Amino acid sequence: MASLIYRQLLYNSYSVDLSDEITNIGAEKKENVTVQIGGFAQSQYAPVSWGSGETLSGNVEEQTLDGPYAPDSSNLPSNCWYLVNPSNDGVVFSWTDNSTFWMFTYLVLPNTAQTNVTVNVMNETVNISIDNSGSTYRFEDYIKTSPTQSYGSRNYLNTAHRLQAYRRDGDGNISNYWGADTQGDLRVGTYSHPVPNAVINLNADFYVIPDSQQEICTEYIRGGLPAMQTTTYVTPISYAVRSQRVARPNEDIIISKASLWKEVQYNRDIVIRFVFANNIIKAGGLGYKWSEISYKANNYQYTYMRDGVEVVAHTTVSVNGVSVYNYNTGPLPTDFMIRNYDVLKESSFVYVDYWDDSQAFRNMVYVRSLNAELNQVRCVGGHYSFALPVGSWPVMQGGSVILTFDSVTLSTQFTDYVSLNSLRFRFRCAVSEPPFRVTGTRISNLYGLPAANPMGDQQYYEASGRFSLISLVPSNDDYQTPIANSVTVRQDLERQLDEMRREFNELSANIALSQLIDLALLPLDMFSMFSGIQSTVEAAKTFATSVMKKFRKSDLAKSVNSLTDAITDAAGSISRSSTLRSVNSVASVWTDISDIVDSTDNVVAATATAAAKKFRVKEFTTEFNGVSFDDISAAVVKTKMNKLNVVDEELLPQIITEASEKFIPNRAYRLIDGEKVYEVTTEGKYFAYLTETFEEVVFDAERFAELVTDSQVISAIIDFKTIKNLNDNYGITREQALNMLRSDPKVLRSFINQNNPIIKNRIEQLILQCRI
């Protein structure tokens, strides 16, 4: 009778209302289609007819001098002239291969008498003799060819303009200017000593000149630099339009203007504040387990001053690429466990969508030349105490990341009431001190920012900087770009969904066990499932369609396609490993396997666990006359939905889909092979026992591998530990034992009607796992 409701969802998840499907396809098309409109980015709809306005055009002269650049030490590209313009005397150039050739150039000022000077060049203190009795500057080259040799003067350049140029060809030979610019013997000389990858040290400001323009470089050596070093644009436009402006931090500049449209450059200082939010969900049971600690998107509104004007800003922060950790101290109900908790690591990104009420965001639809600069943000985690019923509380504390601005794009920010065209700033995460830990556990010295308390003692995190963009806007400032803007797009669906989850989980205590068992032992169908929710059959059909559409994208539905391959792979992995050794009589199979058997058995444990997770789908797709875990899940869903105060057609499909995937995470499945039973759990436990005496025997991995693909999988509603406990305390017949192993509904109901505490406690524990 295995879970008819979920079986119907699976088989019918691709049969939905045609009108709903057409609407869904239309929405996806709107979302995914991109219209190319030139150099502008599009966020929604373009005007019917528009142009870029008047555009400045003309010829651009190539910039001859690229620079000046600050002093540099690197493997500079070859086949370029590097024109140095030092402001002081001393070493202006050095170069070596650290084995057979050392060279540096010393600038000697005019009218310098002969003297000895000490210089520090290439990590070496050198004494040299300098002399320049003339009225021009002298660039003197000093060279040596062995480490023990002294530097000697080789060539020089006398120039009135304090300029010298260097070039390295493809083989690594260095060329520079020799002679004198005033005596007509200025020439280019080459030191033939190929060193392709040697580092060149330029200790003065320098310019870069293409090798093809060596003649221009020579003219600069002779005549000096031109008066102004900027790119020259020759643009034939009217004097009424042409103007020169210096951009200020907060300014609107009209780039071009036509009758209907104009391009405006917006420059803005910006202060970004954001607040991380999280979901902390406590699992069912005795209060020692947490199912999820995760980040969630969060909105934040604030004000700040910009040039004396108050700015109202709105941000939405979200994360991507988080690392998911877990921690489990053991299988007992009183063992502390965190099933999943998010941590921001080096591979994570933080996205902040920013909007403010300034003119820049009023028409942010067609945008180009978007740039931004922001400072770093350091985020330090705080303390979060896990409130246990008994004993000392574990405390998660510490953790830190540094957010570095990475890029900026356009985005649409959804608030509770409107959608806003925004800027999305992406920050890259880098871990920092201190690490985080959980007191009283093995979790320590881990780096990153956990989601338990990412804000620490901070009210908000803040990043300051500026952005600039060019936007195409209507020429009339009273008009607004015709887009679907400022409409109600959602009424905080996330908040409503959280409230429904909370109400759904709180109903666990109000469910009568006898009523639930009776319901779980009945074959539910789609309409009995929704009968307590919708009043008419037609409404139930529509609601069922919505559930199917949601269920179609669930992990459970997707895993059916890969079921056969997954089970076969699991069986193959087990059969290739060695057979398990006998378990000692004093060792319980419910203790940690790794403490009892060798590392080879760990392979079997891991593979058996993987197979156990797939057994649910295998059981799900085959007929089974006993009670399954999904029958209990469906019964809990139906009972809770009947008690919900608010029924929302948009939210309930999400709840049902989550329930199908998350209810009863700790499951056990068994395969019966004559008088022998093989049982594996999703927690990594595996063992074999006899049906006659419940005595544990050797787990034959090869036989288990043969049974995996062919035998019927049974939900171990009453697991081995519970059956053994029942037999030891009350005694059960062989027939009762076999029916219990097959999860027979009549036998389960009879034990519950007799108020058997062991069976009732087991069922109650399963129901407590039905939380999302």
UniProtKB/Swiss-Prot annotation:
Pfam families: Rota_VP4_MID, VP4_haemagglut, VP4_helical. InterPro entries: ConA-like_dom_sf, Rota_A_VP4, Rota_VP4_MID, Rota_VP4_MID_sf, VP4_concanavalin-like, VP4_helical. A motif (YGL motif) lies at residues 447-449. The keyword Phosphoprotein does not apply. Residues 65-225 are annotated as: Spike head. The keyword Membrane applies. One of its GO terms (biological process) is permeabilization of host organelle membrane involved in viral entry into host cell. Signal peptide: none annotated. The record marks T232, Y233, R242, S243 as: Cleavage. Residues 509-772 are annotated as: Spike foot. Residues 388-408 are annotated as: Hydrophobic. Keywords: Capsid protein, Coiled coil, Hemagglutinin, Host cell membrane, Host cytoplasm, Host cytoskeleton, Host endoplasmic reticulum, Host membrane, Host-virus interaction, Membrane, Outer capsid protein, Viral attachment to host cell, Viral penetration into host cytoplasm, Viral penetration via permeabilization of host membrane, Virion, Virus entry into host cell. Residues 483-510 form a coiled coil. Residues 247-478 are annotated as: Spike body and stalk (antigen domain). It comes from the Viruses. GO terms for cellular component: host cell endoplasmic reticulum-Golgi intermediate compartment; host cell plasma membrane; host cell rough endoplasmic reticulum; host cytoskeleton; membrane; viral outer capsid. Belongs to the rotavirus VP4 family. In group A rotaviruses, VP4 defines the P serotype. Some rotavirus strains are neuraminidase-sensitive and require sialic acid to attach to the cell surface. Some rotavirus strains are integrin-dependent. Some rotavirus strains depend on ganglioside for their entry into the host cell. Hsp70 also seems to be involved in the entry of some strains. This is Outer capsid protein VP4. It comes from Rotavirus A (isolate RVA/Cow/Thailand/A44/1988/G10P8[11]). The lineage of its organism: Viruses, Riboviria, Orthornavirae, Duplornaviricota, Resentoviricetes.
